[in-house]
């Protein structure tokens, strides 16, 4: 089996499709498997196209739940957007799914959008594990101490059995910091998304490249 792994598409369907095509992904090849490590929607303008493509062309894709999926569900269940839903692009996703020209109240739009996405949400998992890899969104559940200068340490129990709230927290974690501080899966490589790769190059490689702006390195970061 050959795995094609992407993360944080954020409704940029065109860029996503171009990337997997260039990588050689063939949805008709039974030896090819697509893994998406969360955050399918928000920010870009093509959530509907992305959802239709995954449902129709890649129904066997492995979909891992991200923090933006949590944000989407919580906003839809509230029936109203909060300030962070605008800044994160979640509110706009509702309009992209339901059509900006319809004179519907937001609460009804949210109900319709959630109904559209529910089958995809039901396919999502917290993690996917193979003999050599673990795929997640932020990181595996662990203990986070302090808020600003986060310190991470492993759970005493098996992370695979962590409750729902622990997985929701883990979807926000900086996986590069977690790995550097010893939260690992022995004998396996953890593949994550969520955090910008330029952070790892800037903070851990200390090669003079900035975290953001001109010269930042957004290529995949490989921890030791």
Language model features: what each stretch is:
Residues 1-53, 57:
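N-terminal active-site segment of His-dependent metallophosphoesterases
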Residues 6-7, 34-38, 63-67, 136, ...:
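Active-site neighborhood of phospho(di)ester-bond hydrolases with catalytic His/Asp-centered motifs
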Residues 10, 41, 68-69, 139-141, ...:
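Catalytic metal-binding/acid-base residues of hydrolase active sites
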Residues 16, 46-47, 73-75, 145-146, ...:
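Short glycine-/acidic-enriched loop or helix-start segments at secondary-structure transitions
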Residues 22-23, 50-54, 79-82, 152-153, ...:
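Glycine-rich, phosphate-binding/catalytic loops in enzymes
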Residues 30, 44-126, 131, 157:
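Active-site neighborhood of divalent metal-dependent phosphoester bond hydrolases
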Residues 95, 100-224:
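Acidic, His/Gly-enriched loop-helix segments that form or flank divalent-metal centers
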């Amino acid at each position: 089996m050959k795995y094609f792994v992407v993360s944080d598409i954020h409704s940029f369907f065109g860029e996503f499709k171009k990337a997997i095509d260039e990588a050689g992904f063939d949805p008709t090849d039974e030896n090819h498997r697509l893994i998406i490590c969360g955050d399918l929607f928000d920010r870009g303008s093509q959530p509907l196209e992305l959802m239709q493509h995954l449902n129709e062309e890649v129904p066997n894709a492995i979909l891992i739940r991200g923090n933006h999926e949590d944000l989407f569900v919580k906003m839809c269940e509230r029936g109203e957007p909060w300030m962070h839903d605008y800044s994160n692009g979640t509110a706009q996703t509702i309009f992209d799914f339901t059509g900006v020209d319809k004179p519907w109240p937001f609460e009804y739009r949210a109900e319709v959008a959630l109904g559209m996405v529910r089958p995809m949400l039901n396919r999502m998992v917290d993690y996917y594990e193979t003999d050599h890899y673990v795929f997640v969104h932020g990181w595996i559940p662990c203990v986070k101490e302090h808020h600003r200068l986060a310190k991470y340490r492993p759970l005493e129990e098996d992370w695979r059995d962590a409750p729902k709230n622990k997985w929701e927290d883990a979807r926000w974690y900086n996986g590069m910091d977690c790995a550097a501080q010893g939260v690992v899966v022995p004998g396996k490589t953890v593949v994550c998304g969520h955090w910008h790769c330029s952070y790892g190059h800037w903070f851990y490689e200390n090669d003079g490249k900035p975290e953001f702006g001109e010269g930042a390195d957004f290529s995949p970061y490989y921890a030791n």
